[in-house]
């Protein structure tokens, strides 16, 4: 069921129309099946159905102006904000993050810290911290490049966070110790300047819809590749914006057909949000409703991979023997918070 039926409902105010539709969860993300009833005066009263999703409209209130600052060309204001959905829930945009408290991954290329390795061979791997998940596990080294920000988990435990949440682009690594089978999880965030509107200033365009993208490769202690980002990863979006009309989002959260608001109405963009499950990083989490990751070429990702933060490490990520693929959900432009997971047997 989609919210398209709203167009066929007449003689209602916009507000009434909107709330009537949402009462049945018809932004097709959830039907009216999840309802409860209670007996009042011998009459069964149907309560308001419980919806998983929430819809927001317009720009967020900025709560944290400077999540990260860096005095180099290309740095962008990195802020966090909040806005309230149609159901009264408050949402952090672009997403709740552990940037302030999480362990920063070890730099391979970071203009803000001055670490500018020419290739991965310059990394002293033995000096990279090992985060222990299992005392009797194997040591794995992960190498990451995200557009824009990532948080990396193993068996639901936060292992490390991207040292730079927005711009400039960077490459990093971490080591962890885990026993198979273990679950690798990644929270991928496409940061934005226009909080709540899912857009940024780009080449003079004030409401440019930026893209995401994430690539990683994992090696054992001997240097052999045990995994890399590919289509076997399972992904699911949890924040979609900017949307001209939230009805475009399908029940499986597909948003490929969604259009972006025109520049003249960009401040009125909609967003659709879902709560992140607490157990999404655990082995027993059911990701059956998730999608397989969509693969993107270097050209799809665009300008970010033209920078030395990526180009210096093509021998690592684009090795023909073990080519790591850029992954995201089906909508590279409007899906701003995407979770990804992979079980290593």
Give the ranges of each region predicted by the language model.
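Bacterial signal peptide processing site
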Residues: 33-35
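C-terminal motif of bacterial Sec signal peptides marking the signal peptidase cleavage site
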Residues: 28-31
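Beta-strand-rich recognition domains
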Residues: 40-150, 154, 169-345
């Amino acid at each position: 069921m989609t919210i398209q039926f709203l167009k066929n409902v007449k003689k209602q105010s916009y507000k009434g129309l909107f709330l009537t539709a949402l009462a049945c969860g018809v932004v097709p993300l959830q039907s009216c099946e999840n309802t409860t009833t209670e007996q009042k005066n011998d009459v069964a009263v149907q309560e308001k159905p419980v919806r998983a999703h929430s819809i927001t409209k317009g720009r967020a209130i900025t709560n944290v102006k400077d999540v990260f600052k860096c005095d180099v060309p290309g740095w962008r204001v990195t802020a966090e904000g909040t806005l309230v959905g149609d159901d009264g829930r408050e949402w952090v945009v672009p997403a709740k993050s552990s940037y302030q408290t999480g362990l920063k991954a070890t730099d391979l290329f970071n203009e803000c810290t001055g670490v500018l390795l020419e290739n991965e061979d310059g990394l002293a791997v033995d000096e990279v911290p090992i985060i222990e998940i299992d005392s009797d596990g194997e040591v794995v080294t992960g190498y990451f490049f995200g557009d824009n920000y990532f948080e990396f988990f193993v068996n639901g435990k936060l292992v490390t966070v991207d040292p730079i949440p927005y711009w400039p682009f960077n490459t990093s690594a971490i080591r962890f110790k885990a026993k198979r089978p273990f679950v690798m999880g990644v929270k991928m965030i496409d940061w934005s300047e226009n909080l709540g509107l899912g857009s940024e200033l780009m080449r003079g365009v004030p409401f440019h819809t930026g893209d995401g993208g994430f690539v990683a490769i994992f090696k054992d202690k001997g240097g052999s590749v045990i995994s890399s980002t590919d289509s076997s990863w399972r992904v699911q979006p949890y924040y979609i914006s900017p949307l001209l009309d939230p009805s475009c989002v399908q029940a499986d959260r597909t948003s490929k057909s969604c259009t972006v608001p025109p520049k003249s109405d960009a401040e009125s963009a909609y967003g659709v949000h879902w709560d992140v499950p607490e157990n999404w990083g655990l082995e027993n989490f059911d990701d059956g409703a998730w999608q397989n990751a969509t693969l993107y070429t270097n050209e799809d990702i665009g300008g970010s991979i033209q920078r030395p933060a990526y180009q210096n490490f093509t021998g690592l990520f684009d090795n023909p023997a073990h080519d790591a693929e850029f992954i995201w959900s089906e909508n590279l432009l409007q899906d701003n918070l995407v979770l990804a997971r992979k079980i290593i047997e």
